[in-house]
Amino acid sequence: MERSNRKTRIGRVVSNKMDKTIVVAVETKVRHPLYGKIMNRTTKFKAHDENNAANINDKVLIMETRPLSKQKRWRLVEVVEKAK
């Protein structure tokens, strides 16, 4: 699989308490199937952070990768925006 075909997501770091692992919350807008209202749906991904670069509330870009552990299938590409 080429790197260009891998999924990428942008989200906010919710937790960085684990060593070399961050939890990223990704928000998507979904239309309700019956009522049509647009809702925010949040999904949490565990991502590999090799250098422990990301902090809580940072906006980050993550990319899909091979399974690194039981729950980690994503890795940190870059910190898009630092928390204030």
UniProtKB/Swiss-Prot annotation:
Part of the 30S ribosomal subunit. Pfam families: Ribosomal_S17 (PF00366). The keyword Ribonucleoprotein applies. This is Small ribosomal subunit protein uS17. One of the primary rRNA binding proteins, it binds specifically to the 5'-end of 16S ribosomal RNA. GO terms for cellular component: ribonucleoprotein complex; ribosome. SUPFAM superfamilies: Nucleic acid-binding proteins. Keywords: Ribonucleoprotein, Ribosomal protein, RNA-binding, rRNA-binding. GO terms for molecular function: rRNA binding; structural constituent of ribosome. Signal peptide: none annotated. Belongs to the universal ribosomal protein uS17 family. One of its GO terms (biological process) is translation.
